[in-house]
Amino acid sequence: MVTETLSRKADYNANKLRKRLRRLVGTAIADFNMIEKGDRVMVCLSGGKDSYALLDILRNLQAHAPLDFELIAVNLDQKQPGFPEHVLPGYLSEINMPFRIVEQDTYSVVKRVIAEGKTTCSLCSRLRRGVLYRVATELGATKIALGHHRDDILETFFLNMFYGGKLKAMPPKLVSDDGCHVVIRPLAYCKEKDLAAYAWHAQFPIIPCNLCGSQPNLQRQVIKEMMQQWDKKYPGRLETMFTALQNIQLSHLADTSRYDFVGLKPHGIAIEEGDKAFDEEPLSVIPVDMDHDDDSTFEPENEHDGGAVQGGVI
C-alpha cells in the first residue's frame, strides 16, 4: 500500500514537472519568436540529458502547437574513443524521429592541438559549431536548436564578468557566427535540476560527456559550485538574477558606447530611469519570479548529468 502510494505521488510530481517544462519552453519560444510557421528546426543532440529533454519537449509541442514546423535531430560523431555509435540511431529510430548522424573526426584535431591534460572543450566546441552550421545549410534548416538552459546562461554571465570583464551572457536567440543561421535555446527558462529529474524519469539512454578525457573547465566549475551554494542558502536568488538579465538599465551602468553620458544635460523632466539620489528602491522581500511549484521537482536517486560542463549539448 505504501509503495503504491509513493508510486502514485512520484507519477503525479513527474506529470507536474513535465507540464511546467513544456510551459516554460513554450513561453520562451513565444517571448523570443524562436519558431515560426514553416520552420525546419535542426535539434542538436549530443546524448546528454539536456538535449534529450529539448528534443522530447519540442516533439510534444510540435504535436500540439497551432503552427506547423519540422524537426530533425542531428548528432555529430566526433570519433571520441568509446563513443557508443548505436545508442542515438537506435533511440531516434524507435521514436520515429527523422535524424542524421554526421561523422567528423574533430577529436584527432583537438588532441593534436591541445596539450595533454588541458581542457579541450573550447576548441572542440568551435570545431563542432562549424560542422553543425555546414550541416544546417545542407539540410535546409531555418533554425538550429541547442539545449542550453537557464543555469548555463547564468554561468556564462558570471564567467564573462569574473574572468572576461564583460557584461555578457548567452542569448536565447542569436544569428550564428557565420551570419547564415538563427540559433535558438528553447530551454532558456528551464532549471538544470528540473531537466535532470525529467531525464531520469524518462529514462533517456544518456551518453557520458567525458569520453574525450578532457580535464573539466575549472573556472566554469567554480561558478557552478558558487551558484549551487547560493541556490541552497538563498532560495530564489538565481531566479532574481535571471530576471535581471531581462531588465537592463543602461543609464545606470558605465558603458559610454551604449549610453550617451557625455551628452547628458538637465532638462527639468523627471524620468523613470533617472538618478534618485539617496531614495531607496522599493525592493520586494520575495525574489522576483520565484517558482512556487518546486514541490513538483523530484530528485533522481543517483543524479547523473550526462552532459557535464557543456550541459549535454552540441
Curated annotation (Swiss-Prot):
> Where is this protein found?
Cytoplasm
Q: Does the keyword Nucleotide-binding apply?
A: yes
InterPro entries xref list: Rossmann-like_a/b/a_fold, TilS/TtcA_N, tRNA_Cyd_32_2_STrfase
Q: Which GO terms describe its biological process?
A: tRNA thio-modification
Q: How is the cofactor bound?
A: Binds 1 [4Fe-4S] cluster per subunit. The cluster is chelated by three Cys residues, the fourth Fe has a free coordination site that may bind a sulfur atom transferred from the persulfide of IscS.
| Similarity field | Belongs to the TtcA family.
Q: What else is known?
A: The thiolation reaction likely consists of two steps: a first activation step by ATP to form an adenylated intermediate of the target base of tRNA, and a second nucleophilic substitution step of the sulfur (S) atom supplied by the hydrosulfide attached to the Fe-S cluster.
How it assembles, according to the record, is: Homodimer.
For this protein, the record's HAMAP family field holds: TtcA (MF_01850)
Q: Which PANTHER family match?
A: AMINOTRAN_5 DOMAIN-CONTAINING PROTEIN, SULFURTRANSFERASE-RELATED
The name of this protein is tRNA-cytidine(32) 2-sulfurtransferase
Q: Which organism does this sequence originate in?
A: Nitrosomonas europaea (strain ATCC 19718 / CIP 103999 / KCTC 2705 / NBRC 14298)
Q: Mind giving the lineage of the organism this protein is from? A: Bacteria, Pseudomonadati, Pseudomonadota, Betaproteobacteria, Nitrosomonadales
Gene behind this chain?
ttcA
